[in-house]
Amino acid sequence: MVCTGYATVPHALLMTLCKRWHAETNSFHLPVGEMTVTLDDVTCLMHIPIEGRMWSHPKKMSRTDGTDLMVRHLGVQQAEVLKNCNEEYGGYISYKALREYYEGYIDSATRLSDPKNLGDPQKLERVLTAYVKSYFLYLVGCLLIGDKSNKCIELVYLTTMEDGYAGMHNYSWGGMTLAYLYHCLAEASLPGDRALGGSVTLLTVRNCHI
């Protein structure tokens, strides 16, 4: 799943669909009639929950707040986080840096769980927790709520993990994915806009079933 996203979908198809999108009805106006993406499509094609709390963040997260989230949830040293959180863009991290983090956690967990050289079990648990959270954040960016730059993900999504794994299940990830896709399609349908954010994977798969 981490290999999907904006870089792997047919851009010409997406831009053609954007030209057909009408924000007033949240639907595509095609020669054969109207079509849209529904919550039923989300749950059937992506198998993510559509029930639960909706979540939004109207303000862009600052670099300072994003750094605090990285330190608290992913166990990264503050000095290292500041290198990867650009001052200009605030609380964002690149896919490349995030991928390096979770791949590093995999290597650390493998060493700590080696029967021939068992490490501190509490440290192993912290490493595994950081791995799951960083991988989840990567999936959110690649599959569900992608940035139109196709380069980075907002660190604010780490706040959905404040209550642990059980708390993450309380959110309607399907509902948020669809709402954000509608928003991105409305922006991309405007004259002069040539980029599309949101779950382009969902949009592509849905249109393969027309």
Task: Name every feature range the model reports, one short phrase each.
Residues 169-176, 188-201, 207-210:
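Compact beta-rich and alpha/beta scaffold cores in large eukaryotic transport/transcription complexes
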Residues 1-182, 198:
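N-terminal leader regions that mediate targeting or early regulatory function
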